[in-house]
Amino acid sequence: MRILSWNVNGLRAVYKKGFVEAVARMDPDILCLQETKLQEDQRSQEMINFDTYQSFWDYASTRKGYSGVAVYARKRPLANRCGFGVERFDAEGRVIELDYGRFVLFNIYFPNGQKDDERLHYKLDFYRDFFSYADALKDQGRSLIITGDFNTAHNEIDLKNPQSNKDRSGFLRIERDVLDDIISRGYVDSFRYLYPDTVKYSWWSYRFNARKNNAGWRIDYFFVSEDLMAEKVVQDAFILNEIAGSDHCPVGIELDF
């Protein structure tokens, strides 16, 4: 099974930049999208009934053209839900949960901390409350796959210019500590686990020819519960730098299912 995650930075925009062809090339069984920036009535029929996939959507109720996540899946899950039961976070349309029995998949657009203390606290609170929810499932023996745009680069290897960005949200020590804590609680960064020394990025600013110069950040992840690595269910993890259309590129994992 191949699962991909891609922050498209506007689904309508990326449809005009070769989205259909890119998905055909990547051929995922499940495709998780972040920052769709859509309301329910803004979806085209092509978006709803894309190829052979079933689609699942979550939208921001706080304002239009903001946030939003979607999942395209070839196989219908046993159950699905939006959000995780905390209204201040669920209102921004950031989470889809799909239960496939063997594993539970979360597609998440984690908040951006920005330069604003209020949004940084919101981001940190989101991390805390979501992973408390995830921990409860894991404690019940569920295998978890948590993917999406985490909006944080974990270590210096995960961005081109760590020193000049150490005071910028996305690489603040307090944000990086959260990822340390997630790992200590039994979640594995699948790409870094399999490729400890590989330098690859998943996001580049639109400014300063950042993508051309590969001045990027790795902020898109597949975190999985430890059992999926220990049992070698996760066969590979990868970053598809060659896929254009957004300021992010897709990331993915291959599972032995």
Model-derived features: positions:
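Metal-dependent phosphoesterases centered on the DNase I-like endonuclease/exonuclease/phosphatase
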Residues: 30, 51-54, 126-215, 219
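Structured beta-strand-rich core segments of catalytic domains in phosphoester-bond hydrolases
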Residues: 37-39, 45-113
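Short catalytic/ligand-binding loop motif for oxyanion handling, primarily in non-cytosolic enzymes
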Residues: 12, 40-42, 64-65, 114-117, ...
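Conserved beta strand-loop-helix elements of the APE1-like EEP
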Residues: 64-80, 198, 210-231
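Surface-exposed cleft-lining segments at the edges of enzyme active sites
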Residues: 85-86, 111-127, 163-167
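Active-site beta-strand/loop signature of hydrolases that rely on acidic residues for catalysis
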Residues: 7, 23-41, 105, 134-156, ...
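Active-site beta-strand termini and strand-to-loop segments that position acidic
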Residues: 74, 98-101, 225-226, 246, ...
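N-terminal, active-site-proximal structural segment of metallo-dependent hydrolase catalytic domains
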Residues: 1-50, 57, 61-69, 82, ...
